[in-house]
Amino acid sequence: MLQGIEAHGDVALTPQLFAEFQLDYVRGTLKAVNEPLPRIPPLRTGVGLRWQRNALQAGGHVRFVATQDRIFSTETKTEDYRLLRLFASYSFGDSNMTHTITGRLDNATNELYRNHLSLIKDLAPEAGRNFRLLYNVRF
């Protein structure tokens, strides 16, 4: 049996400043033996701020991931962690096509963490601090 909740919201603090939040949680149980289902993610929450003025955006987001210790018999516990993402973007184009260039710094604090859903979490942690330059076209 699976039970869960997911929520996401944005709030305009000013015409140019927005706060966002997200939360998701799943609980899975194999009812026949009353044991936790495998590969169920832990509770995850996040908060962020985004500034936007015309074609420019910048902001940050912190994601909090709880310890996962409600585990299937063959799994190992995964410790909690926090991730900081910073970004800035610029958009241009017209009503037919919009181009967006984004610079994004993921795991800005270089946190050592393991994703509970990773099949190799016991062998290798997730990526440390990394930068991405993204180009997106919408048409």
Regions found by a protein language model. Name each.
Residues 8, 32-38, 73-77, 120-124:
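Outer-membrane beta-barrel domain signature
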Residues 71-78, 85-89, 99:
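Short, glycine/charged-rich beta-strand-loop motifs at protein surfaces that mediate ligand recognition
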